[in-house]
Amino acid sequence: MKLEVFVPRAAHGDKMGSDLEGAGSSDVPSPLSAAGDDSLGSDGDCAANSPAAGSGAGDLEGGGGERNSSGGPSAQDGPEATDDSRTQASAAGPCAGGVGGGEGARSKPYTRRPKPPYSYIALIAMAIRDSAGGRLTLAEINEYLMGKFPFFRGSYTGWRNSVRHNLSLNDCFVKVLRDPSRPWGKDNYWMLNPNSEYTFADGVFRRRRKRLSHRTTVSASGLRPEEAPPGPAGTPQPAPAARSSPIARSPARQEERSSPASKFSSSFAIDSILSKPFRSRRDGDSALGVQLPWGAAPCPPLRAYPALLPAAPGGALLPLCAYGASEPTLLASRGTEVQPAAPLLLAPLSTAAPAKPFRGPETAGAAHLYCPLRLPTALQAAAACGPGPHLSYPVETLLA
């Protein structure tokens, strides 16, 4: 008779019971193995199919004892297997949750609507101009933009900071305090600066003042020759010179001639030099002669200098040629005749007899300008002696 069958079973860690079971016959079934391995399965199946943590722990303990009795692993492997099963279950849980969260995020993709083709300055100005009182708060400006443009209705809210920054950093917007005692309040009004109308000129909203172009200055200076008002009836209009001359056909040259003072007003500027018509030497001589009219009265007597002739109250006179004018009659009142054929070096005005002129270069038909000349001692002696021989050197050397 085998007594080990009726011995009460000890705990899992009892080594004596396990030895007795190993020493006895293995044909006798254990009372704890009635359910068998078919109902419990492996450790992983036990952890997955257990209805509760407590019941699962009890089953695991029973399974560990059964394995010990059937010659399986020792009782110390039971807690390790339980920990492994719990680790697998906890690892499987986050993975399943992550997969579900990813599917939920993919179901709501972020779609950003196209941004309106205006700057924030333009958008804010449009909102303020469309208002009834010409001023809006920051919240009202945001509501206006959200109602008019779909871009501002999405989940993106960074544009609100852009609106606030543009309001405070640009001079074209002025803050109007709702309560002067609370300047730090956030419910103040914003309106357009009346001194910054250039920013919103022509319906275009600019950040900086528009530069004055050359065409605007030309149109503001006056009408062009083609746009001149018509004359009275029956008066034929002369053809403009710009059509006949090939140089004036270019629009750039016309603009430069029409407004020479827009770039540089000096007479030495390139535009002012090019704007003057070309004149030949003959034309310039005739114009110079016209600009030098002679007076009817003679020149007043000049003050005598010690270096001049001692007897000459007005000193000696040197003719300076000026083309295109008639001979002045400076000595007509004193009865002295002047030869107009050549430049003369006249004697003192007080002498009754005319002095013999000194011959110079032939300038027939030329007029002369008379000015006092400081003569050297040789010429003073020659003039005092009266008529004398011709000088061997030209008069031009005296002017040098």
Swiss-Prot record:
Residues 55-66, 95-104 have a biased composition (Gly residues). The gene is Foxq1. It holds the Pfam family Forkhead. The keyword Nucleus applies. Gene3D superfamilies: Winged helix-like DNA-binding domain superfamily/Winged helix DNA-binding domain. GO terms for cellular component: nucleus. GO terms for biological process: hair follicle morphogenesis; negative regulation of transcription by RNA polymerase II. One of its GO terms (molecular function) is DNA-binding transcription repressor activity, RNA polymerase II-specific. It is linked to Defects in Foxq1 are the cause of the satin (sa) phenotype and results in a silky coat with high sheen arising from structurally abnormal medulla cells and defects in differentiation of the hair shaft. SMART domains: FH. Expressed in kidney and stomach. Expression in the outer medulla of the kidney and the transitional epithelium. Expressed in the hair follicle medulla. Keywords: DNA-binding, Nucleus, Transcription, Transcription regulation. Plays a role in hair follicle differentiation. Residues 115-210 bind DNA. Its main location: nucleus. It comes from Mus musculus. The lineage of its organism: Eukaryota, Metazoa, Chordata, Craniata, Vertebrata. This is Forkhead box protein Q1. Residues 32-54, 240-251 have a biased composition (Low complexity). Residues 1-112, 213-264 are annotated as: Disordered. InterPro entries: FH_FOXQ1, Fork_head_dom, FOX_domain-containing, TF_fork_head_CS_1, TF_fork_head_CS_2, WH-like_DNA-bd_sf, WH_DNA-bd_sf. Residues 228-239 have a biased composition (Pro residues). The keyword S-adenosyl-L-methionine does not apply. It is found in: Nucleus.
